[in-house]
């Protein structure tokens, strides 16, 4: 049973990622699971049991039933991307706050409809990008904004890849055009794009151009691709995402005075700590045989895993709205929209034989 200070969350769908977020809800001090829904009552029951849901959790055999539950404040929605626009809008119309898995939609037009519904009904929306809630990320932003240690940003490289096995490449929803049809771009690319935007203080690039050589499956879903991003003042970024390459998740940001590197930015090597390296005004010794000042490593200890930090922040925002009459925080849908815009631009460039795509006015 929820306490007065806990936000009551319903889980809409029993996707694999929902196991991780269910644990995060258990760990977050200001949230609890109050309901779960699947299109099969038996599946919802089995999922609740397997994930140690509270005995008081209501089990729903349809998404509609979960939406009608008056004892649910907010929904976590891990449905396939193609279903987001339908169910997120329905959730908003029922006054439910929404923690929406990424990518948030198949395109920005769909996401704008979701945001319009949220704004019309006064509900909070946040996407499920977990790493931005890790305490490490605040320190990354602090270094990037330090004019003495980092200077002015010149370029960012970000990548996320993993090697899907034969079963994944044949059967996972992320390779199915009718489910998560954005493929590696929407899944892995979302993270790499978010990292480049974060480093650029969420200023959208002027142009986006996909690199030739994107790999698509027989159904036309992207399995691997890369792109370059360019800003008006000469800043650049490159992103790479793939279901066909070794597990890698890196950010390198280079400024006029400093360099930032993160080797595990999406999922830390260890759940309870996260590291990054920085260097400032690096140079060689007189004989150019070694560095005078090699990069320094910084480690951040975490009380909660980053996904629980995400739930805690989401629940805090919902609590402010529910209990204190606060307005929804527009920062979260705004950065979701910018990420989706760049995802859309990369896909458009791939579809148009790697043409340069302008983001002016979007």
From Swiss-Prot:
Question: Which terms are listed as keywords in the entry?
Answer: Acetylation, Oxidoreductase
- Give GO MF terms, alphabetically: nucleotide binding; oxidoreductase activity
Disulfide bonds, paired cysteine numbers: none
Family statement = Belongs to the Gfo/Idh/MocA family.
EC numbers for this chain = 1.-.-.-
Cellular component terms, GO, for this chain's entry?
cytosol
Q: Which residues carry this modification: N-acetylalanine?
A: 2
Q: This chain belongs to which protein, by name?
A: Uncharacterized oxidoreductase At4g09670
Assembly:
Homodimer.
């Amino acid at each position: 049973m929820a306490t007065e200070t806990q936000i009551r969350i319903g889980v809409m769908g029993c996707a694999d990622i929902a196991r991780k977020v269910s644990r995060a809800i258990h760990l977050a001090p200001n949230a609890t699971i109050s309901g779960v829904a699947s299109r099969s009552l038996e599946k919802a029951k089995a999922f609740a049991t397997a994930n140690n849901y509270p005995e008081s959790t209501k089990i729903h055999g349809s998404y509609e039933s979960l939406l009608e539950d008056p004892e649910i404040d907010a929904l976590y929605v891990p449905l396939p991307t193609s279903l987001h626009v339908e169910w997120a809008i329905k959730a908003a119309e029922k006054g439910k706050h929404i923690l929406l898995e990424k990518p948030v939609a198949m395109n920005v037009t769909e996401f704008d409809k979701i945001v319009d519904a949220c704004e019309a009904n006064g509900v909070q929306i946040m996407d499920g990008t977990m790493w931005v809630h890790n305490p490490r990320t605040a320190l990354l932003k602090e270094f990037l904004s330090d004019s003495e240690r980092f200077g002015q940003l010149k370029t960012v490289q970000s990548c996320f890849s993993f090697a899907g096995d034969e079963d994944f490449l044949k059967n996972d929803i992320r390779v199915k055009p009718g489910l998560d049809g954005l493929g590696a771009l929407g899944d892995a690319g979302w993270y790499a794009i978010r990292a480049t935007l974060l480093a650029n203080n969420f200023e959208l690039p002027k142009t986006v151009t996909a690199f030739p050589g994107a790999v698509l499956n027989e159904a036309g879903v992207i399995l691997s691709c890369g792109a370059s991003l360019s800003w008006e003042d000469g800043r650049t970024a490159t992103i790479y995402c793939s279901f066909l390459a070794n597990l890698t998740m890196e950010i390198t940001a280079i400024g006029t005075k400093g360099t930032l590197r993160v080797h595990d930015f999406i999922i830390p090597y260890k759940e309870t700590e996260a590291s990054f390296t920085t260097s400032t005004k690096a140079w060689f010794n007189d004989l150019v045989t070694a560095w005078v000042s090699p990069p320094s490593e910084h480690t951040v200890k975490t009380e909660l895993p980053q996904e629980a930090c995400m739930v805690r922040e989401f629940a805090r925002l919902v609590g402010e709205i529910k209990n204190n009459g606060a307005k929804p925080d527009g920062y979260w849908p705004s950065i979701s929209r910018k990420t989706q815009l760049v995802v859309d631009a990369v896909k458009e460039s791939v579809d148009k034989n790697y043409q340069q795509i302008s983001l002016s006015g979007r």
